[in-house]
Structures are given as structure tokens and as C-alpha cells.
Curated annotation (Swiss-Prot):
SUPFAM superfamilies for this protein: Flavoproteins
Protein family: Belongs to the flavodoxin family.
Species this chain originates from: Enterobacter agglomerans (Erwinia herbicola)
Designated name of the protein: Flavodoxin
UniProt-recorded Gene Ontology molecular function terms: electron transfer activity; FMN binding
GO biological process: nitrogen fixation
Length: 177
């Protein structure tokens, strides 16, 4: 088992594709990505380093049945983590959103995961600058005007995804390897 676990929730399959790309770029130092609807709490807690990916649905929600998803996803999985101790774990987040059509909640679901893992004692790494995006609001922005993780827009900036992932992974290396 590798020391890095990649977990994702998805609605349309785009987050799964990005998780697979990240796994490929990590070239053997991470286990294959796990969809949270098939993952167990024990699998999640077994990794010292977690890369967590989510799309943002509706009004800034995590994917899940309550948000209109067809399947269970992050909404349901986070319930299994309500008492989890993530102290000593390093977490990095990536989120998918559409900054033009959902400008008022661009990648806001990343903030829900961020708040959850911080409250459980994890150390979050991999903040990303706001520059290069055009949106009106994102709950995923911190006070320093950086995102809590890597925002990706597969609808409007898909041509920047691979370059952004490469830069983000380089930034993460000192903290996760």
C-alpha cells in the first residue's frame, strides 16, 4: 500500500477523470483513486496523506443524494467521518467547478471538505492562488485570497488542467513525500 490515498466524489465523471490523471502523474507513489461511494472509513483512515477531490453542485454543495446526485457521494461519506481523528494526516484538496455558469459558488464544495478535515485535526496543504479565474464568489477562498486547494474548471479552462495539476503536485511534494 502506498502512503497517499486519492479519494473523490463525482456526479458526471469529471472528478474521477481528474483523480485518475493525478494518480498517473504521481507515478506509483499513490494508490489507485477510490470513489467515496465505494470506499470504507477504514480505507480512508489508513493513509497518512489524503488527496480529496470534489465537484461543486447547486448552491455550493458536496455531491450526494440530497444535492440531487443519482448516487451516494461525499455528503453521505462525510457522515462516516463525524467522529474520525485525522490528527497527523496531511490533506490536499482539488475541486471542479464552472466559473462562468456557476460563478456565485465556484468550487465552494472544497470549503466544506476543508472545514471538515481541519475540525478533525488534519493539516491541509496545497493552497492555490486566485489569479487566472473569473467568478463572483467562492467559499473556497481563504482570507489570504488563496483557494483551500486546487480549483479546476473542466468546462471553460480544460486546456489549463494538466499544467495546473503539474504545478500543484510540485508544490505538494515537500509536504507529502
Amino acid at each position: 500500500m502506498a502512503t497517499i490515498g486519492i479519494f473523490f466524489g463525482s456526479d458526471t465523471g469529471q472528478t474521477r477523470k481528474v483523480a485518475k490523471l493525478i494518480h498517473q502523474k504521481l507515478d506509483g507513489i499513490a494508490d489507485a483513486p477510490l470513489d467515496v461511494r465505494r470506499a470504507t472509513r477504514e480505507q480512508f483512515l489508513s493513509y497518512p496523506v489524503l488527496l480529496l477531490g470534489t465537484p461543486t453542485l447547486g448552491d455550493g454543495e458536496l455531491p450526494g443524494v440530497e444535492a440531487g446526485s443519482q448516487y451516494d457521494s461525499w455528503q453521505e461519506f462525510t457522515n462516516t467521518l463525524s467522529e474520525a481523528d485525522l490528527t497527523g494526516k496531511t490533506v490536499a484538496l482539488f475541486g471542479l467547478g464552472d466559473q462562468l455558469n456557476y460563478s456565485k459558488n465556484f468550487v465552494s464544495a472544497m470549503r466544506i471538505l476543508y472545514d471538515l478535515v481541519i475540525a478533525r485535526g488534519a493539516c491541509v496543504v496545497g493552497n492555490w492562488p486566485r489569479e487566472g479565474y473569473k467568478f463572483s464568489f467562492s467559499a473556497a477562498l481563504l482570507e489570504n485570497n488563496e483557494f483551500v486547494g486546487l480549483p479546476l474548471d473542466q468546462e471553460n479552462q480544460y486546456d489549463l488542467t494538466e499544467e495546473r495539476i503539474d504545478s500543484w503536485l510540485e508544490k505538494l511534494k515537500p509536504a507529502v513525500l
